[in-house]
Amino acid sequence: MSRYRGPRLRITRRLGDLPGLTRKAAKRSYPPGQHGQARRKRSEYAIRLEEKQKLRFNYGVSERQLVRYVKKARAQEGSTGTNLLKLLENRLDNVCFRIGFGPTVPGARQLVNHGHVTVNGRVTDIASYQCKAGDVIAIRERKCSKLLAEANLQFPGLANVPPHLELDKPKLSAKVIGRAEREWVALEINELLVVEYYSRKV
């Protein structure tokens, strides 16, 4: 399944607030479609699927990528759900979003893909790069790159930079000073349901 490029508010109407996907708020509180206002009892599978979709759309990853992250999370020590969230939080595109270089995760990914971002002084255009403690993420020394980042920093997607990231606004750079913790994930999600969803599939 490829990355979603359709109407974003349609997704937030169905799944709720997704800060990584869009800043806009849905005007209608019920899901889209002809039967959106109908009250139906959802099955356990539907609830788990919805939580999985939240994760996929918020972080902008494909189904194949998410399966890969679930396998990695299982191989690590500790809670699979927490490990999964940490892996997604440490993606370069998400880190750029969290520090305000991009207005959304897709916006931050475009910044990375177009070569506007450096990691430890080297241009890195791989959005899935796993940031680790000690990494310095900065905007490339080009006028167009700086203008883009400065414009986005004036209106960041989220109000607070998480404590494991240290932003230096004047230098347009940030340092990863620790590990992403569960409590600083901006998305409202039950990651255990995502793990349960994949328990028989992966």
UniProtKB/Swiss-Prot annotation:
Record GO cellular component, one term: small ribosomal subunit
Residues covered by region (Disordered): 15-42
Disulfide-bonded cysteines: none
GO molecular function, one term: structural constituent of ribosome
Stretches that traverse the bilayer: none
Ranges of residues in domain S4 RNA-binding: 90-152
A single GO BP: ribosomal small subunit biogenesis
Keywords attached to this entry: Ribonucleoprotein, Ribosomal protein, RNA-binding, rRNA-binding
Gene3D superfamilies reported for this sequence: Ribosomal Protein S4 Delta 41, Chain A, domain 1, RNA-binding S4 domain
Pfam entry (one): S4
Superkingdom: Bacteria
InterPro entries, alphabetized: Ribosomal_uS4, Ribosomal_uS4_bac-type, Ribosomal_uS4_CS, Ribosomal_uS4_N, S4_RNA-bd, S4_RNA-bd_sf
Entry-linked CDD domains: S4 (cd00165)
Family: Belongs to the universal ribosomal protein uS4 family.
Function: One of the primary rRNA binding proteins, it binds directly to 16S rRNA where it nucleates assembly of the body of the 30S subunit.
Assembly information from the UniProt record: Part of the 30S ribosomal subunit. Contacts protein S5. The interaction surface between S4 and S5 is involved in control of translational fidelity.
Protein name, UniProt field: Small ribosomal subunit protein uS4
Organism this protein belongs to: Synechococcus sp. (strain CC9311)
